[in-house]
């Protein structure tokens, strides 16, 4: 519960213990470039995907969870494939900022669950517990400077456009109930122009560019090693004050001591 994490943080603060901010990693790239697959591969190589959600040191967030609620008129367009889901205005940036700030403060947060078939938010939430590393993926993660500046590492998944289109066609037909003609029209009308205008220009902000997505194990292994340094040896260095400006160690509950390191 959110109240539990807030009480825990308050108790630690009153006892003079500093709380380290989580390490936020932004993962951007075009539609169906493999952003989710890269994040999942990182989780797998770290062994975090087999750990209970309450105990994970690394968690994944998706910008897709933060699509705005559509008006009846917008929803009617969406059903026909005539609504631009790749425009910055399609996302609830205010909620993204609030969520990121809460995560930075070590709070438990509740993430909306979006239904791509009905184009609406479900009446349920995903609970995200405090973690040491947060991977936040989405097509426009680096578009807003306010959001972009919160990431301590920025990754851009760079995949061939033809590969991305073929993946999107297969995904939208099999998972989202779309017709082929609708998927192609939407890609030509909205997706491709939006990528070129809003997503591709943000590639310059990336610290690491990952060609071929999850197939690029060399790049992913380097990123995994960096995250392992944060989870393992990094803690020892930060115990002494971590004077380089990245914060101090997040204090763990007794129940957290069993987490693998």
Curated annotation (Swiss-Prot):
Keywords: ATP-binding, Kinase, Nucleotide-binding, Transferase
Catalytic activity: uridine + ATP = UMP + ADP + H(+); cytidine + ATP = CMP + ADP + H(+)
Presence of keyword ATP-binding: yes
E.C. number: 2.7.1.48
Family: Belongs to the uridine kinase family.
Function as written in the Swiss-Prot or TrEMBL entry: Phosphorylates uridine and cytidine to uridine monophosphate and cytidine monophosphate. Does not phosphorylate deoxyribonucleosides or purine ribonucleosides. Can use ATP or GTP as a phosphate donor.
Protein name, per record: Uridine-cytidine kinase 2-B
């Amino acid at each position: 519960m959110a109240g539990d994490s807030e009480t825990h943080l308050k108790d630690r603060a009153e006892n003079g213990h500093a709380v380290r901010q989580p390490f936020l990693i932004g993962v951007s790239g075009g539609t169906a470039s493999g952003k989710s697959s890269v994040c999942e591969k990182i989780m797998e190589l770290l062994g975090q995907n087999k750990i209970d959600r309450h105990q994970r040191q690394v968690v994944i967030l998706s910008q897709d969870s933060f699509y705005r609620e559509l008006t009846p008129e917008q929803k009617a367009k969406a059903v026909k494939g005539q609504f631009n889901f790749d425009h910055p205005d399609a996302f609830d940036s205010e909620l993204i900022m609030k969520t990121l700030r809460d995560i930075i403060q070590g709070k438990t947060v509740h993430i909306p669950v979006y239904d791509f078939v009905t184009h609406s938010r479900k009446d349920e939430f995903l609970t995200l517990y405090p973690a040491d590393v947060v991977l936040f993926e989405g097509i426009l993660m680096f578009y807003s400077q306010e959001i972009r500046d919160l990431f301590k590492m920025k990754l851009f998944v760079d995949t061939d456009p033809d590969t991305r289109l073929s993946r999107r066609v297969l995904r939208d037909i099999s998972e989202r109930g779309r017709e082929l003609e609708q998927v192609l029209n939407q890609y030509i009308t909205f997706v491709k122009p939006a990528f070129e205008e809003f997503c591709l220009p943000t590639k310059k902000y990336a610290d690491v560019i990952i060609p071929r997505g999850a197939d690029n194990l060399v790049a992913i292994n380097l990123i995994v090693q960096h995250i392992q340094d944060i989870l393992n040896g990094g803690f020892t260095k930060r115990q002494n004050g971590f004077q380089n400006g990245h914060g101090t160690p997040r204090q763990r509950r007794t129940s957290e001591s069993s987490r693998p390191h």
